[in-house]
């Protein structure tokens, strides 16, 4: 029979962090996953604009205009039952995406079904708004740590290149952790590979 590629849902929006979107997207596509990248009020082929965040000596990250990223699916057509897992990008988009009730619903549906969920950098801002972190260990961009604590989660400070796994949730602080979070996420979805 035909091998059906596992589908992953990726939530992103304008000024999503460039590396935190494109790197996991391409890595999962390379492995054969179908990655449906969606944004509220947008359809497949519509563009979101990425932001490039970095540390250049100021007290917080700098931001530069990144690339145009073409969405691969329609937000309004999302049925969470079709997906093996959810990946939430970081950057500036999580702050406003969490104001869309359907975004919150989507997150809660993945947690209710105990499906793998990954969130990087500012991505956990969506998890805190969805009230799904009670009793869970999670990391994030350090400035999001207080939100995790207030949401009843346990904020874990780790190196930017690391990821934290608690059950079917995997989180990472920033784009140096792209490899770690993507690796743990696909493991949670049952992927096995050998070199």
Each model region followed by its residue ranges:
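Short, thiol/selenol-centered motifs that function as redox-active sites or metal-ligating centers
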Residues: 120-123
């Amino acid at each position: 029979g035909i091998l059906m590629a596992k589908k992953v849902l990726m939530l992103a929006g304008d000024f999503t962090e460039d590396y935190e979107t494109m790197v996991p997207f391409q890595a999962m596509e390379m492995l054969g996953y179908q990655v449906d990248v969606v944004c509220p009020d947008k359809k497949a082929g519509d563009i979101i604009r990425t932001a490039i965040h970095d540390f250049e000596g100021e007290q917080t990250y700098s931001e530069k205009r990144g690339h145009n990223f073409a969405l691969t699916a329609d937000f309004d057509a999302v049925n969470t039952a079709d997906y093996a897992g959810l990946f939430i990008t970081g950057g500036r988009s999580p702050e406003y995406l969490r104001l869309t009730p359907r975004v919150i619903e989507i997150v809660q549906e993945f947690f209710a079904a105990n499906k793998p969920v990954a969130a990087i950098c500012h991505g956990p801002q969506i998890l805190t708004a969805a009230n799904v972190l009670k009793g869970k260990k999670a990391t994030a961009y350090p400035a999001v740590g207080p939100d995790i604590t207030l949401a009843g989660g346990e904020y874990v400070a780790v190196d930017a290149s690391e990821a934290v796994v608690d059950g079917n949730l995997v989180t990472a602080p920033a784009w140096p952790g792209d490899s770690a979070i993507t690796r743990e996420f696909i493991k949670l979805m049952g992927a096995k590979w050998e070199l």
